[in-house]
């Protein structure tokens, strides 16, 4: 990719609160420098601040850049602004999360993990380890699913990919499965609810995206007698699992411990995998994603 002009891009991310976003920023900065383009990379203080992100997107449109990058916190909240950008002739490139239902033609490309498939991958690796424990359990077993929200495409699909694949694998082994907890995940999963399930998928979503609330969700799941595993669908949830476990010390891969699996990396998660607190994590390529955003913005501007 080569830039035909010294373009300026506006990029609206989900924030800077995780090392993941710092890595995306690094990739974008390096590629912008290589191509001779400039960018303004912004994001809200918290991934709960949807209204702030919409305001940032409106400001980005008013700056009249060659193109805009957007990692949408909500699949619905940005639609009016996306229509405005389209009317102004400013192409939008999605990253990290897509914007399903965006006004037609407003989002020209998307740089993201296949989040549903990534959730399925986490489930496949997890089920391999849990299979014997499910078979040996006399009663029901509970698998916790921690999602930081029920609004962004990436978080929802990583959760649903995990839920649907665990259910598929468990049902293939002859078990009944149900999903309980957060309504969005219960309704959107492929699992038919049943009262007498062998495998319970229990979805916890905090009222706001804070480390404290998610750590409390983790502790609630760890304190349920039938919990055998917890899955966190991003860096926020994975780190909250580590924090929530500090006083309880229930996570691990021993027979009487709760298996912890998560998403993304970062110092805390890598250390937790290394010391055995977490069994493993599915990681993305955030630096490459940042570079890909700049490439796609440049191609759109060209």
Report each predicted region and the residues it spans.
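A residue-level marker of the well-folded mature domains of exported/periplasmic proteins
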Residues: 1-302
